[in-house]
């Protein structure tokens, strides 16, 4: 059975939907009830004995330097394209580390570290079964294999979350496909997730990792941040 050896944390984005909080603090470093979001991610990885951790940085990158001092094994990778390209650029600059890796966003809160367990059977995303309507990416799964994915959501499917695992074989493949899309095709405004899911779907047999909805919270905007931590209400009241 494959086992995760390293992690890649995406932390280069601008966090525009969380202005004005993110005007001075990169989104993964924003504190929710006193704890930085990225700390819940790194601590969760450590609980699963994953210590080789690459953090891809861009916007306000200097604020992440403290992580290398606070956590042994954390290394920063700079994404010089963060403000001109979509997040395909972040995985592109970290492409040497995808084999046997778990890839996850730094701007989410991990409530259940078990969802980051290192053992896995096939490459794929942590997912939550959704009966009701959602506008998030929704996967169709047959016999444990993802057979389709809708970018516009739907209902009655597996909602994809930004935690994924990649075998050594699929990691090599994904590295090659990233280079083709980013370097040769200049396809630089897509999500990195598009590469396996939509650009080369026939070359991967992705599975899913079922989890519960409240094992993790993705904080997308200021109103969601306020719902979790009332101390941020002041930003709305100041407007």
Which residues make up each language-model segment?
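Conserved core of the sugar-phosphate nucleotidyltransferase
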Residues: 112-186
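Conserved beta-loop-beta/alpha segment of the NTase-like Rossmann-fold superfamily
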Residues: 65, 69-137, 169
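A structural signal for short hydrophobic beta-strand segments in well-ordered beta-sheet cores
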Residues: 29, 139-141, 208
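Conserved alpha/beta core of the MobA/IspD/sugar-nucleotide pyrophosphorylase nucleotidyltransferase superfamily
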Residues: 2-7, 160-239
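N-terminal nucleotide-binding beta1-loop-alpha1 segment
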Residues: 1-23
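Conserved N-terminal catalytic core of the sugar/cofactor nucleotidyltransferase
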Residues: 1-9, 35-100, 184-187
